[in-house]
């Protein structure tokens, strides 16, 4: 299978293909040097072809693998996959500018490449919280193919709702590929927590004095037993209760990993684990996104959290690829 991955990040699609035992020639467009570092550390066979805005406008004539990509004929790519930046589309951004924003407007670069490459299949991923208007524009541009919303919580311990547009080239036109909702594997946060993990950053280990209200204090002191839940369960907060100050139970799902949020625990959420509140480790975040434990260990924790927050959820991509590979 010949694959072109746009906004490739840490090559989640390559990981999904590996787990499905699908051989591939994998071409990746990515500009984040740390994400590329992670990708190269895990897969030395990926051909990195640079900034999406320069594709088919410039390439390294001294790199034979680049030339191999550019010499391919239109229609030779089997799969085009990408998740264009969501920052201007996400409800998390108060002044979101939609598809006119500097980053989310890169969707149109994806569209340009889709029309130039004409792959047999395409997958586009983006946030489910985008406005109705943005969703309608993307759907219209993608040949009226309707997206399916899949929550990663069905396949992992993370609550992460995303839209997926999946199309197949049939007689010169793109048609909808029917994707079924995955079956719930009933994986919860408690199932992926590292054993013996100790957080040495004291500011993440809280006691009752950090809390304004009594709910969390009561929970810690009485040690109440709970059932498991299929969504994030918020126990309480400290300071002003912003996203990075909220504490959740590991008996539910994690909140959605975030690449850019600030605050003490905003990228992963804070969770009550063995009597203290802490953020998740990068290994635990790898598990939430379906990667091997040490997938991002080549970079700092800061860059590891960021790259995982920007990534696809591997089991979801595997689920979609199963539907595609069966008809290739």
Task: Name these PLM-found stretches.
Residues 45-52:
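Conserved SAM-binding strand-loop segment of SAM-dependent methyltransferases
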Residues 55-79, 84-262, 277-278:
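Class I S-adenosyl-L-methionine
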Residues 39-40:
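Conserved SAM-binding loop
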Residues 32:
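Conserved SAM/SAH-binding beta-strand->alpha-helix loop
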């Amino acid at each position: 299978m010949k694959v072109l991955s746009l906004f490739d990040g840490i090559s989640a699609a390559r990981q999904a293909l590996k787990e499905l035992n699908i051989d591939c020639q994998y071409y990746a467009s990515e500009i984040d040097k740390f994400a590329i570092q992670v990708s190269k550390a895990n897969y030395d066979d990926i051909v990195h072809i640079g900034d999406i805005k320069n594709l088919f406008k410039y390439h390294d004539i001294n790199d034979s693998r680049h030339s191999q990509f550019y010499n391919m004929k239109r229609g030779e790519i089997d799969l085009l996959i990408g998740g264009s930046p969501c920052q201007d589309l996400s409800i998390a951004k108060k002044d979101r500018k939609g598809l006119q924003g500097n980053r989310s407007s890169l969707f149109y670069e994806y569209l340009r490449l889709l029309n130039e490459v004409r792959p047999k299949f395409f997958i586009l991923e983006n946030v489910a919280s985008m406005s109705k208007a943005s969703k309608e524009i993307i759907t219209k541009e993608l040949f009226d193919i309707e997206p399916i919303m899949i929550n990663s919580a069905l396949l992992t311990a993370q609550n992460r709702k995303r839209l997926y547009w999946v199309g197949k080239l049939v007689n010169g036109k793109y048609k909808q590929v029917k994707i079924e909702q995955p079956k719930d594997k009933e994986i919860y946060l408690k199932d992926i927590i590292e054993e013996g993990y100790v957080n040495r950053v004291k500011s993440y280990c809280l006691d009752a004095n950090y809390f304004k209200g009594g709910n969390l204090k009561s929970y810690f002191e009485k040690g109440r037993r709970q059932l498991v839940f299929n969504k994030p369960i918020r126990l309480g907060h400290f300071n002003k209760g912003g996203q990075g100050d909220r504490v959740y139970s590991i008996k539910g799902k994690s909140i959605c990993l975030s690449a850019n949020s600030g605050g003490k625990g905003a990228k992963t959420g804070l969770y009550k684990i063995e009597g203290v509140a802490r953020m998740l480790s990068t290994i635990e975040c790898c598990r939430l996104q379906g990667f091997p434990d040490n997938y991002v260990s080549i970079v700092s924790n800061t860059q590891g959290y960021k790259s995982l927050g920007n990534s696809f959820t591997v089991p979801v991509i595997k689920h979609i690829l199963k539907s595609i590979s069966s008809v290739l």
